[in-house]
Design a protein with these regions (language model features):
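Extended polybasic, low-complexity segments that bind anionic RNA or targeting/receptor surfaces
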Residues: 22-137
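Glycine/serine-rich anion-binding loops at beta->alpha junctions
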Residues: 1-21
Length: 137
């Protein structure tokens, strides 16, 4: 008849047929040097300090794991979208802060530039200042 040979009915030419060059899995991650990562962390912290969005809180002890108590303290400090850096994640801190929208709890070794820039305010608890400083050196 002069028409091109289509082969079988599951050929990529046909509707409902095979996929010829389908999507391939790719890696989109790339390496960032240690010096650049440290510089980015330093710049993120200095931007929060320059904008008066960095608080250092002394004596932030919770008597029990209650969100109500934590919300009251956060309200008194004027925190809305804040990243709280604690020296360690205690049971009371984790349980009382996890249900508050916009408030994230982290430790100095888990601190990331993305988290700092994502949150408007940065709260350093007293014991977390020194580990953050040692990470910047």
């Amino acid at each position: 008849t002069g028409r091109a040979r289509a082969g079988y009915n599951r050929s990529p030419v046909w509707r409902g047929g095979a996929i010829l060059f389908g999507p391939q899995p790719r890696k989109y991650d790339f390496k960032v040097n240690k010096k650049i990562r440290k510089l980015a962390l330093r710049m993120a912290l200095s931007s929060r300090l320059a904008g008066d969005n960095l608080l250092v809180v002394k004596g932030f002890d919770l008597p029990e794991a209650k969100t109500k108590i934590f919300a009251k303290i956060a309200g008194n400090l004027g925190l809305s979208k804040a990243l709280i850096i604690a020296p360690e994640e205690t049971r009371e801190l984790v349980l009382s802060s996890r249900n508050l929208p916009g408030i994230t709890l982290t430790t100095p070794d888990q601190l990331s530039v993305y988290e700092i820039l994502k949150h408007k305010q940065l709260v350093l608890l007293e014991g977390a200042v020194e580990p953050v400083e040692t990470r910047l050196k």
